[in-house]
A protein has these predicted regions:
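Well-ordered alpha/beta subsegment
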Residues: 5, 95-136
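Residues immediately within or flanking Cys/His clusters that coordinate Zn2+
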Residues: 32-35, 49
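Short functional micro-motifs and their immediate structural scaffolds
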Residues: 46, 58-61
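Conserved hydrophobic positions within beta-strands
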Residues: 68-70, 102
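Short, conserved beta-turn/loop elements at beta-strand boundaries and strand-helix junctions
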Residues: 73-79, 121-123
Length: 136
């Protein structure tokens, strides 16, 4: 993947993140998939937030399962960072929808399909990305 990233994308990926996003990526780097959750509303949120968007209370962290269902996907033929084509996807995991890369042929993917979630380190950015692998 070296050399495929335009300078503008590098600047975007390395920009200063808020504390909740930094904590999310730190946890991913430690092998934990987590989201923020309001104890009062009992609602998990992603992207992670310091305060609940519904009631404004501070949020804590909850670990998410490593399985979910494919919510949406699309093929990006001119990928900015990935070997083209990349299959960008959203997966429903517990109460949240997470972004990632679908791992499998586009033609074999189905909305609602069960997926397991793998954490994949990205050496160019130092971040860990989510990969959705069809389960079964």
């Amino acid at each position: 993947m070296s050399g495929l990233q335009p300078p503008a994308m590098d600047k975007y990926l390395r920009r200063e993140m808020d504390a909740a996003a930094r904590e999310f990526y730190r946890r991913l780097g430690d092998g934990q998939l987590a989201a923020t959750r309001c104890d009062r509303c009992e609602r998990a949120t992603f992207p992670p937030r310091a305060r609940c968007p519904t009631c404004g209370e501070p949020q804590g962290w909850v670990e998410l399962p490593r399985s979910g269902r494919l919510h949406a996907f699309t093929s990006q033929e001119s990928a900015l960072r990935f070997a083209a084509p990349a299959v960008l996807a959203l997966a429903e995991v517990a109460d949240v929808v997470l972004p990632g890369i679908a791992d499998g042929p586009y033609e074999a993917l189905l909305i609602g399909q069960a997926v397991r979630i793998e954490l994949r380190p990205e050496p160019d950015t130092g971040l860990t990305l989510l990969a959705f692998v069809p389960d079964g």
